[in-house]
Amino acid sequence: MAGSRTNDIKVYCSFCGKSQDDVKKIIAGNNVFICNECVALSQEIIKEELSEEVLADLTEVPKPKELLDVLNQYVVGQDRAKRALSVAVYNHYKRVSFTESRDDDDVDLQKSNILMIGPTGSGKTFLAQTLAKSLNVPFAIADATSLTEAGYVGEDVENILLKLIQAADYNVERAERGIIYVDEIDKIAKKGENVSITRDVSGEGVQQALLKIIEGTVASVPPQGGRKHPNQEMIQIDTKNILFIVGGAFDGIEEIVKQRLGEKVIGFGQNSRKIDDNASYMQEIISEDIQKFGLIPEFIGRLPVVAALEQLKTSDLIRILTEPRNALVKQYQALLSYDGVELEFDKAALEAIATKAIERKTGARGLRSIIEETMLDIMFEIPSQEDVTKVRITKAAVEGKSKPVLETA
């Protein structure tokens, strides 16, 4: 029951002692009363405590070596990229912690958002997810191809922020220290070096819209998503401390790098560098190449950390299948163990799975579907076959030439 009187008897707040005449509203409970002022004060106390918890978390940011150790437990290969990400993430949250306690005359530290470049299935999304999980911060993923600039049919860039707020259970202060990964960023690059005279709905316009939230602004986000409407309540969120990681395959950027490096070889200058055909051009990418690919200079400037990921080799994919803490082979072994069955993969079978993933150009993300294809019938039949004690996956089974080998009691 809420009100200022209870059966016309004068009531007082049980917490501050003020009467109903001294406050705007008194809420009655079971033999207890609370005024609107104490409710507001309680909300402030809770908000401050939650904020202190967030700040306390930031003071315990793992050091780069510790972050790298975590990544090594889950991510195979990509050593240079993992090292670059570990340093960038550590510096970002060190900056956030420093900014909270800085004096006005201290050095103003700029954000160091991250651009990840690498082929499909090389681990870009998984790296970002693993970092967010290890830091215990809210994490959201967005697809750049679904975004359009304001006024066009599609998703506003502010909806990316809503996903982060939702991941933080609508705790805005916690969301303001989260991580957002924007995938397929290369798909909104301008095609070619000539600027189109027509309006670029999903290209440069989206880059400009993303630029505002990436560099740091107070954005108004519709609580239910969708387009903004007049008189609609908005959630205000400051993006200055949100770490943005953007990624894409950037198919063809190696040719841009080769062309740039090749131009230096053609001349007669003594500082010309010799290009090794076997060298990794991905590690040679600079801002000039990314701009030539089609991202605007202002956008590139807000992504000072560039982490290049390599195409995964057969040996890398085999390690991914077996080594990480959550390796797929371990997962399927655990699944069958619940039925009392041992699962074994022949070495040749693992090589066949990795080869298939490379042929399909799906990288690590295609490994699970290949195992599912191979084991579908087995996982269907095993629960009903109580005499089976072991399943062995062979190369022939992966290639569809025979069924997995079953051993019975």
From Swiss-Prot:
PANTHER family: ATP-DEPENDENT CLP PROTEASE ATP-BINDING SUBUNIT CLPX-LIKE, MITOCHONDRIAL, ATP-DEPENDENT CLP PROTEASE ATP-BINDING SUBUNIT CLPX-LIKE, MITOCHONDRIAL-RELATED. InterPro entries: AAA+_ATPase (IPR003593), ATP-dep_Clp_protease_ClpX (IPR050052), ATPase_AAA_core (IPR003959), Clp_ATPase_C (IPR019489), Clp_protease_ATP-bd_su_ClpX (IPR004487), ClpX_bact (IPR046425), P-loop_NTPase (IPR027417), Znf_CppX_C4 (IPR010603). NCBIfam families: clpX, PRK05342.1. The gene is clpX. The lineage of its organism: Bacteria, Bacillati, Bacillota, Bacilli, Lactobacillales. It holds the Pfam family AAA_2. The keyword Transferase does not apply. It comes from Streptococcus pyogenes serotype M12 (strain MGAS2096). Component of the ClpX-ClpP complex. Forms a hexameric ring that, in the presence of ATP, binds to fourteen ClpP subunits assembled into a disk-like structure with a central cavity, resembling the structure of eukaryotic proteasomes. Residues 1-54 form the ClpX-type ZB domain. This is ATP-dependent Clp protease ATP-binding subunit ClpX. Belongs to the ClpX chaperone family. CDD domains: RecA-like_ClpX (cd19497).
